[in-house]
Curated annotation (Swiss-Prot):
It comes from Rhizobium johnstonii (strain DSM 114642 / LMG 32736 / 3841) (Rhizobium leguminosarum bv. viciae). It is an enzyme of class 2 (transferase). The keyword Transferase applies. The keyword NAD applies. This is Probable RNA 2'-phosphotransferase. Belongs to the KptA/TPT1 family.
């Protein structure tokens, strides 16, 4: 059993190299974002005192389900800034989705909507509680935005859902956004 601090550090590093900088660990992602688990294990072992079993434990126990491990290959489920194709299928969203963010972002969002920035998609939550958890990672006061996903979808916007249940969209135009009740 590895210590929580090391587990968190290794998990964050895995997210970093599998989503943003595979070359930092000497890895090369394929077009779908996959890399050999053996290669990742070797890269992690050169940086941390961590076993194969502990890496698998990190993947399986990650509360955010950030990774998929299959057929001795691993990838991050979403949040990439490197050019990959997650081969996501379009899905019909629930009537409402939510986005947690910092209050300081509201003025820009109110003018321009939600943008994917350096990522492939805007990340949305299926419930307010999850959006609050996401917002809590941001500095300062937080707000929860409600996305009229049903209307967006009916008007031709595409939605996808990642392997770990995060809803994804190319963008969310301002006309589909409202500040959720109960937030500042």
């Amino acid at each position: 059993m590895m210590k929580a601090r090391l587990e968190t550090e290794v998990s964050k590093y895995m997210s970093y190299v599998l989503r943003h900088a595979p070359d930092a660990a000497g890895l090369t992602l394929d077009s779908g974002g996959w890399v050999s688990f053996d290669e990742l294990e070797k890269a992690l072992a050169s940086k941390y005192d961590v076993s194969r079993a502990e890496i698998i434990e990190i993947v399986e126990n990650n509360p955010k389900k950030r990774f998929t491990l299959a057929h001795n290959r691993i990838r991050a489920n979403q949040g990439h800034s490197v050019d990959i194709d997650l081969a996501l299928n379009q899905a019909e969203p629930p009537a409402a989705l939510f986005h947690g963010t910092s209050l300081t972002n509201w003025q820009s969002i109110e003018r321009e909507g939600l943008k994917k920035m350096q990522r492939h998609h805007v990340h949305l939550s299926a419930d307010v509680e999850t959006a609050k958890i996401v917002a809590a990672r941001r500095k300062g006061e937080h707000i929860i935005l409600r996305v009229d996903a049903a209307r967006m979808f009916s008007e031709g916007h595409s939605f996808f859902v990642s392997d770990n249940g995060v809803w994804l969209a190319e963008s969310v135009p301002v006309q589909y956004l409202s500040r959720n009740a109960g937030t500042p």
